[in-house]
Amino acid sequence: MITNWDSVAWAFNDFSIDSVIYIQEATLDDWEKVITFLNENDSLVFEVYNYEDFDPCKTTNQIDREFIFQSFSNHSETDDNAKAHFSLNGLEINCFFEFKDQIELCFQAGSVKSIDDYKKVEELMIKLSTLLNRMVTLAYEGGVVFPLIKVDVTRGIIEVVDEKKYENRFYSLKYRILSLQSKFLEIFFPEKNRIMWVKIHEDDYLPKKIKDNAW
């Protein structure tokens, strides 16, 4: 259990970005357990919304397993989508069912303002790690490979990355090479440079293997 707010406050000081609790390499069995767990929350609201205008076309207080599992096996861009929203002692959390192999619980980073708020997040991560018997991480949206916090109850791990280490991630050899490549393309092929960064940004939001994580 992290008890020093100063050691984690830096990770929650931005209202413009979402923090995400990630469960990587998830299985349908993991989803089944998480859906059952979330359905036990009295504040849960499950919405199915129209893909064209994002207006809710179905709202209930329980996640529809059949709809979610069907969407995993046969989903197109023109199908309706779904999300679940619940309150965790005042912390507002959303779950979007985008990927079969990665579970994501999102909340506004800046809503965690104290050690008490942080404990709510950590306790949720501990419950999920215990429930699934696997590692659970927290990272910024689109940054799953750079965890801020790791929790693995089985291995006795509750760790927060050092702020300086996190900031230095862009000084790795991989990113230095990418930076040089980008500078070259920007001078001679600016459109290719733009396309490259669009693809990188899109790829950041796709599921990642645990082995791809920076630590």
Labelled PLM ranges:
Residues 1-66, 70-71, 215:
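Long, contiguous N-terminal structural blocks used for assembly/anchoring
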Residues 1-3, 107-215:
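Acidic, proline/glycine-rich low-complexity IDRs
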Residues 7-10, 91-94, 125:
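Catalytic micro-motifs at enzyme active sites that drive phosphoryl/nucleotidyl and oxygen chemistry
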Residues 11, 65-76, 125-130, 186:
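Short linear motifs in intrinsically disordered
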Residues 13-15, 99, 130:
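Solvent-exposed loop and beta-edge segments used for protein-protein assembly and interaction
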Residues 16, 100, 142-144:
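Short Gly/Ser/Thr- and Asp/Glu-enriched loop/turn motifs at secondary-structure junctions
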Residues 17-25, 101-111:
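Short, hydrophobic/proline-enriched secondary-structure or compact coil segments at domain edges
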Residues 45-107:
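Short, intrinsically disordered low-complexity segments
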